[in-house]
Amino acid sequence: MPYQFSEDEDLKMLRESVRKFANTEIAPLAHGLDEREEFSLSLTQKMGELGLFGTIVPSEYGGQGMDYLSYIVAVEELARVDGSQAATIAAHNSLGAGPLYYYGNEKQKKQYLPSLCTGEGLWAFGLTEAGAGSDAQASKTNATYDATKKEWVINGSKIWITNSANQLTKGITVQAITGKKADGRNELSCFLVPTGTAGVKAKAMSGKMMWRASNTGELYFDNVRVPADAMLGEKGQGFKIMMETLDNGRLSIAAMGLGLAKGALELTIKYANERETFGQPIAKHQAVAFKLAEMATRVEAAENMLYKACWLKQSGQAFQKIAAMSKLYCSEVAEFCAREGQQTFGGYGLMKEFPIERHYRDAALLRIGEGTSEIQRLVISRYIGCK
């Protein structure tokens, strides 16, 4: 498949559709939802009706069957306006429905995916713990097998889990320790745990700096029993599932970074052409014009890197190195554009009613979530031959 720099008609239509939705449905509500730290049930359901749930899942399971670039463009367009709504869709697709589709057996796919592709429900990915972020081997959540009842018993907790504690949450994929490997490291496995399961407690977290209108939960598992067939993939496959899921998730975070950067650039260009000092628009001052030129250049570079990673993935080639580079670069370009945009807005950039202020806060998470910038540099260094 040749690498193309132009969008086909289907992709153009998708971009226009999501952009229109973001501008007309999300933008008018974004400030209020952020201020109230409110997860919007109605907006989430509308995004489901638009076809943004189950984007990469084939139609036989109720999904849209999009290629990966189309999904990434949809996330990008949402993030251009509001990081919170983009986070809901990105986490649900790459961390929720994605692992179910890629690693689930037929029974699991048919049981869960149809409702997760329509906006009826959300699914979360329980990986991070209070003492286990970048170091997944430090996990404490464990699962022991009760051979008599043919059930796994899960105990532990997870934290900062997107989409895990709201009215639409249907379940969580939980990574837990199921034994020890020959080398002494923890053996990790994944389990599908519906939210109504006895012993599961989900608490919505508040007081966030960013993504205040997305749902983030703290999860507790107290002798949670799930049947043997609730295991996702094979026993001991948890680390592989986690790593491959995060490879895909890095593209989602990169898309959010690219979208945020584009949104910040658009807002700043508009403001710079309207705001006057010394008798002319500030965009005519070299100090501002050159800043905008630098922002635009970095956005262009970020877009090309991310789209190349998507092309590699959907053409069946190794994409993991470029995914890590894209996540790293797009998140840092987002921070740069939000910061420079806020600086250009001056005092107005510090006021919450101006979207650039929200972009500035939202950008902070992108350098941390799904692998910090430091971890991305470590991953990249290994790919390029640093031993």
Regions inferred by a protein language model and the residue ranges of each:
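A short, Trp-centered hydrophobic/proline-enriched beta-strand micro-motif
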Residues: 119-127
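Glycine-rich, charged/polar anion/phosphate-binding loops
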Residues: 126-129, 139, 157-161, 173-178, ...
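Flexible, small-/acidic-enriched active-site or ligand-binding loops
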Residues: 138-140, 196-227
